[in-house]
C-alpha cells in the first residue's frame, strides 16, 4: 500500500472549510464552487464521469475525518507525527511519498487554486503541497516528502503539467514499481 500525498492526518484547508463554511451561510455557494472545480479538474484529467460531493470530501479530508479513518485502518501509521510507521504489517508493505510546493508550472491552472488553499488552511507554518501538510503525507516507510510538486502534480493530473525542474511524477511511480519488483512483489 502506498500513500501518495495522502491526507493521513487531514488537510488544514479542509479544517478551515469545516470551521468556516459547513453549516454557515456560504455552504451552498461554496459547495457549488467546489463541486464545479472538482468537475472541471476531473474533466481535464480525462475522468468526466466522476461525481463530486465537495462537502463530504471536506469532512473526510478534515483532521477529524482522517482520524476516524486512521482509527479504523491503523496499519502503517507513523509512531510520531512526521515520523515513519511500520513498513510491513500482516504481510502488507506500507510506503508513502509526498511533496511540497504550490506554484510549480506557469501553465498549470491548479497553481492559483493551491496558492489560495495554502493561504487559507491551518498548517501551523508547515510546508504543504497546497492542500496537505508535509508531515500529514507520511505513512509507513516514507520514501521522500520534499518533491517540489503540488497536490495534483503528484498524481500527474492536468495534462501532466508539473515542475520542469523537478523529478517527473511518472519517474516516481516507475521507481516504486521497480522497488516492488526488486522485492519480489
What are the functions of these language-model segments?
Residues 2-185:
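Helical cap/lid subdomain of alpha/beta-hydrolase-fold lipid enzymes
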Amino acid at each position: 500500500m502506498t500513500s501518495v500525498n495522502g491526507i493521513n492526518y487531514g488537510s488544514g484547508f479542509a479544517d478551515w472549510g469545516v470551521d468556516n463554511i459547513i453549516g454557515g451561510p456560504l455552504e451552498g455557494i461554496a459547495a457549488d464552487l467546489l463541486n464545479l472545480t472538482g468537475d472541471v479538474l476531473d474533466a481535464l484529467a480525462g475522468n468526466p464521469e466522476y461525481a463530486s460531493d465537495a462537502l463530504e470530501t471536506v469532512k473526510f479530508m478534515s483532521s477529524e475525518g482522517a482520524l476516524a479513518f486512521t482509527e479504523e485502518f491503523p496499519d502503517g501509521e507513523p509512531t510520531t507525527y512526521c515520523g515513519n510507521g511500520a513498513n510491513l504489517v500482516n504481510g502488507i508493505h506500507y510506503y508513502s511519498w509526498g511533496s511540497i510546493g504550490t506554484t510549480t508550472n506557469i501553465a498549470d491552472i491548479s497553481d492559483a487554486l493551491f496558492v489560495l488553499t495554502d493561504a487559507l488552511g491551518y498548517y501551523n507554518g508547515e510546508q504543504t503541497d497546497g492542500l496537505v501538510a508535509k508531515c500529514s503525507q507520511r505513512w509507513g516507510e516514507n520514501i521522500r516528502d520534499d518533491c517540489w510538486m503540488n497536490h495534483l502534480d503528484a498524481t500527474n493530473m492536468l495534462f501532466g503539467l508539473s515542475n520542469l525542474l523537478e523529478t517527473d511524477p511518472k519517474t516516481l511511480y516507475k521507481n516504486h514499481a521497480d522497488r516492488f519488483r526488486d522485492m519480489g512483489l
